[in-house]
Swiss-Prot record:
Belongs to the class-II aminoacyl-tRNA synthetase family. Type-1 seryl-tRNA synthetase subfamily. This is Serine--tRNA ligase. Keywords: Aminoacyl-tRNA synthetase, ATP-binding, Cytoplasm, Ligase, Nucleotide-binding, Protein biosynthesis. Transmembrane segments: none annotated. Its EC number is 6.1.1.11. Pathway: Aminoacyl-tRNA biosynthesis; selenocysteinyl-tRNA(Sec) biosynthesis; L-seryl-tRNA(Sec) from L-serine and tRNA(Sec): step 1/1. It is found in: Cytoplasm. GO terms for cellular component: cytoplasm. The gene is serS. The keyword Cytoplasm applies. PANTHER family: SERINE--TRNA LIGASE, SERYL-TRNA SYNTHETASE. Homodimer. The tRNA molecule binds across the dimer. L-serine binds at residues 234-236, 288, 388. Consists of two distinct domains, a catalytic core and a N-terminal extension that is involved in tRNA binding.
Length: 428
């Protein structure tokens, strides 16, 4: 959530930064609502002051022996009653407009960091670096879904019977490979200083609002209407709310967490895209990285989180590239984002496998997560950062494609062999 005071005091500069996203966000309706609320607050304060003055005057006159039935006392009491009604009416109007103001504020995205490259689409994202170019092989490569079905690792047809399209059932070595990847990722991140968390998979609307999924992305998530619970679209959501409505001490920061969860998404806007394989499913597994940090250390934490995600691909010896998203491609809650894209040889291109974002104080304002410096007055909002470390299904797809052998088998990456207890999956 944006700082209302910033919007109020620097409307032109704030609008200009929003416009860098190349989206039609307009802060003027919000400023009009804010002005109306503040005007009513001022009127209510004046009416309350007059009401208090009347109360004191009546009390004083009664102590001086005035007749309670006198016209003067009756007139003062009548004015006091009218003022109370006016105040009540103003409070009701103010509550309604303040609710509209808060709702509008929740629809505005984060402001891009000044260092983010200007651009309107993913075509203007900037490549930062590549790793593993020497491991990219030439030739014809089978796509991962053909490899998996041939080796009996997963079954899409029966999954459609069980659920619907865009679901998968993992079998045998396929299920074992996914379990190995999850354990490997969690072990690597806990060794890097993250605390493992196993959060609820069902989350309430307040948690989705705090992280920025609601109200904008309500159509992207699966909801249990009877209980106001949603299937989590990412562990970022419950991790954001770990400290919702809490005040931390500065010496607690940074707080770094990793969590494995299944993730559930409707993928409503992706009709016809990636209809085969593990790239775009309604249910998929992911290991998420999350940090609560001091604002002064936010950028350094972002670089650290990115390195932690990249380290998984390096350990698996999977070629990848890292790009910085331009302003027009930023996610709703992010002020700066790096995407990591892994090489898929069957397609001859890189595909996103992780998105590492610095959200500044945007999510912390929505979740009301603050911290206090020792010996200082007041509190400040923490900064939050999140990233995939990594998307498990896409990592499996990359392993199957990059490690496929001429005889039809798949060599197990050396880093996974202690987890999978085999060096090769499948035989010709």
């Amino acid at each position: 959530m944006l700082d209302l005071r910033l919007l109020r005091e620097n409307p032109e500069a704030t609008q200009a930064r929003l416009d860098r996203r190349h989206s039609s966000y307009d802060i003027q309706p919000l400023l009009s609502l804010d002005q109306q609320v503040r005007q009513w607050e001022q009127e209510r304060t004046q009416l309350q002051a007059r009401s208090n003055e009347i109360g004191r005057s009546v009390g004083q006159k009664m102590r001086e022996g005035a007749d309670p039935q006198s016209e003067e006392i009756a007139a003062l009491r009548e004015e006091g009653n009218q003022l109370k009604q006016q105040i009540a009416d103003l409070e009701q109007q103010e509550r309604q407009v303040r609710s509209e103001l808060d709702t509008y504020l929740l629809t505005l995205p984060n402001l891009p960091d000044e260092t983010v490259p200007l651009g309107s689409s993913e075509d203007e994202n900037r490549e930062i670096h590549r790793w593993g170019d020497d491991r990219i092989r030439e030739g014809e490569f089978a796509p991962h879904w053909e490899i998996g079905e041939r080796l009996g690792l997963f079954d899409f047809e029966r999954s459609t019977r069980i659920a619907q399209s865009r679901f998968v059932t993992l079998l045998g070595a396929g299920a074992a490979l996914e379990r190995a990847l999850i354990a490997f990722m969690l072990d690597r991140q806990t060794a890097a200083g993250y605390t493992e968390v196993a959060p609820p998979y069902l989350i309430n609307s307040a948690s989705l609002t705090a992280s920025g999924q609601l109200p904008k992305f309500s159509e992207e998530s699966f909801r249990c209407d009877r209980d106001d619970l949603w299937l989590t679209p990412t562990a970022e959501v419950p991790l954001t709310s770990l400290y919702r409505d809490e005040i931390l001490s500065a010496d607690q920061l940074p707080l770094r967490y990793c969590a494995y969860t299944p993730c559930f998404r409707r993928e409503a806007g992706s009709y016809g895209r990636d209809t085969r394989g593990l790239i775009r499913l309604h249910q998929f597994n992911k290991v998420e990285l999350y940090q609560f940090v001091h604002p002064d250390h936010s950028e350094a934490a972002h670089q650290q989180l990115l390195a932690n995600a990249e380290a998984i691909l390096q350990a698996l010896e999977l070629p990848y590239r890292t790009i910085e998203l331009c302003t027009g491609d930023l996610g709703f809650s992010a002020q700066k984002t790096y995407d990591i894209e892994v090489w898929l040889p069957s397609a001859g291109r890189y595909r996103e496998i992780s998105s590492c974002s610095n959200c500044g104080d945007f999510q912390a304002r929505r979740a009301n997560i603050r911290f206090k410096e020792a010996g200082q007055k007041g509190t400040r909002f923490v900064h939050t950062l999140n990233g995939s470390g990594l998307a498990v299904g896409r990592t499996m797809a990359a392993v199957l494609e990059n490690y496929q052998q001429p005889d039809g088998s798949v060599r197990v990456p050396e880093a996974l062999q202690p987890y999978l207890r085999q060096t090769v999956i499948g035989q010709p």
